[in-house]
Amino acid sequence: MKKYKNILLGCTLVLFFVFATTFTWLYSQINSALPMLDGKADIFGLSGTTVIERDGNGIATIKGEQRNDVAVALGFVHAQERFFQMDLLRRNSAGELSSLFGPAALKHDKKIRRHRFRERAREIIKHLPPQQLALLKAYTRGVNQGLELLKAAPFEYLLLQQEPVFWQEEDTVLTIFSMYIDLQFEYGERELTLGMIKNTLGDDMYQFLNPKGSRWDAAIDNSRYPQSPIPVQGWQANSAASHSGKTQASPSHYQDLALPGSNNWAVSGKLSENGSAILANDMHLNLRVPNTWYRASLEYRNHENQAVKVTGVSLPGAPSIIAGSNGDIAWGFTNSYGDWSDVILLETNEDNSQYLTPDGYLPFTTYKQVIAVKDQQSVEISVRDTIWGPVIGENYQGQMIAYRWVAHDLNAVNLNLTELEQAKNTDQAFAIAATSGIPAQNMVVADKAGNIGWTIMGPIPVKLGDIGDVPASWATGENSWSGYLSPDLYPKIKNPESNRLWTANSRVVGGEMLDKIGNGGYALGARASQIRDNLREKSRFNEQDLLDIALDHRAKFLERWQDFLLTKVLTPTALAKHDQWQQVKTLLDNKELKATTDSVAYRLVRNFRLNVKNQLFKGVNNQLATVDNGNTYDTYVIRHQLEIPLWQLITKQPLAYLPPSTSSWQDLFEQALAKTVEDMTADQALEDATWGQQNTAQIRHPLSRAVPFIGYLLDMPATELAGDKYMPHVQNNTFGASERMVVAPGFEHQGILHMPTSQSGHPWSPYYGKGHDDWVKGKVSPFLPGETEYTLTLSNY
């Protein structure tokens, strides 16, 4: 017996030793991947000493002799803090995730390879102006030396059992291509869906589901467009069969998924306390660890030997300050949702080897693509191109389609945005915007002299023929793109009479300017109208006033739904049938609806609306899914304009649209409310079913789902969040303001800037997670970096 005890003890000691050794090695490796914060480092490619200072939150101030030196240092800190994030961005657009993650990413890689983004990135690099190429080379040198000077590879590679691959100049272009993928439709989903709606349901229904305007419109030029009338015939799909199947009521359904967007607004110097214009900007993106942006302040001397200081947010993978202030101007962006692409119906010969063009039938150009797959053999695929763009598949009728997209052209990407760092006024910013290569954005700019302006930053195609919302053939030559809009013709507005500007992903202008921009799927104007109304309520502003607008979570959009519930649904008859509904009425009565974490009323109204929408549009969604033979095209891609026909239907209540599972419109509303209450009270009392309980942060690292227990170290706290989608304070579980910035150029010391997660991508960093709570609570946190706590000096060798 004693012998077995000794063996057991020996085995235990061996196991403990192995565990301790493994843990010590693992700890050492992860600890070695921490960035250099203090001391000195010798770096190749600097013209002089460059200093990287960090404050207690890790916010970097980079001081160099010239812009290229600062680019080296910015690349250095990006690599040391965020290389894995940069790697994912380049691999995402290049279709190279499989080499990192294995077969799980192969479907994505095969699909995205149709765009051949790495080949396009290489071509763009060849055509960059010498000064921009030099800047990009400097940044790349910094990235690779920053990666090399880590004592161990970033911890993610240890977990994946991979080695990081050095950065190339083309990878910065791929990073920007990933932003194109995030901000625009890479497969023409919206046009394909609208084309299917028009062909399947008819033109009247197409106009009804895709209205040009509504009461929510808040264009800065006060332009208005009418909503479309309700077609008489009703849903063609309104049969019991089309409504069969499970009605969605999952948590994801109740998220009512948002679209990448943003808010920005500005007031001129005539309305500010110091004479400078003031800008506010919060860019809405999917939230993850680490955050999309990296905060930085860059100081250098330009070619005229003038001092430049620019502060804001940078994108790891690129050498520019994306949004910020330079003392003379401040600028920020919202996604424009203009029409930057077109789906082309190809007319092919019998064996699909050729397609018809204005010059007759031409053969497809075929490209071989080899996809490396972790721990497996490489996969080889072929992709086809046309004179207009890549073949991206077939439409619902089986017709081959190609895609014409700004992202495929040489002017899709350049580094002109970097010139904003030295712009002196709004007019100079306008000129830079009109030549910049980024996914087209609404740029709002404010300058120290008090001027404000709006324009589009990014390429604007000039379109000929009848193209736009739905797929069309280009075979005859009547439909085409004729280059890009010249800078002098760009839409812009400067110093409007109101001294106020605002954009929020909805339609910004009408008339000729709208004709140039087009409609690529505008958001409903609910956010924009609430921002506009807030701006109109005051005649004087400071930075706090603009932050208050960013944090406004009053549910103005849902007020009419609250009233509808109280007056049309919670009738005496309905209250008599449902005992619990008196409590619902009490919760809703005489309350200003706000998306606060403790609000039960907000959650009730919001989820009731979604259940009504889901039930009402279920038949047409199912019909489109059936016609499309199980593919993913449905009204999801036009969901943000569906509020307009939805409200028309519930107020007019035409019988032709009543779902067969309901006996009357009142029955539909009562079913929707019953489902709402049932879901909210599944495991708790109604009074405990708060909005914060549903809207709890799930801001995670990409690896936390795949590696057991690591989320405990990497993910942000599961905090209840105020705010929602159809209000300025956009904040959901995994989506929201990736930064909030308020700044008056020349008065940056009074500015405000905070963002989720933190500067660091390493969980053992001394500032990991610092600043996140400011973002959650909307605290005033300084725009400029704080006192220096860490200093790293880079010297040339």
Question: What do these predicted regions represent?
Answer:
Residues M1-F17:
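N-terminal Sec-pathway targeting helices
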Residues G10, T22-I278, M283, V289, ...:
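Substrate-recognition/specificity elements adjacent to catalytic centers across diverse enzyme folds
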Residues G64, D69-F101, G332-E380, N479-R527, ...:
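Gly/Pro-rich active-site capping loops and adjacent beta-alpha segments
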Residues V70-A73, K111, R120-L133, A402-R404, ...:
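Second-shell loop/turn segments in exported
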Residues L298-S320, G324-I329, F333-E478:
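Glycine- and hydrophobic-rich flexible loops that cap the catalytic core of alpha/beta enzyme folds
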Residues S436-K538, L604, F608-L616, A625-T626, ...:
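Hydrophobic alpha-helical segments
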Residues K516-I517, G521-K577, W665-Y797:
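Terminal end segments
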Residues V605-T690:
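Charged, long alpha-helical assembly modules
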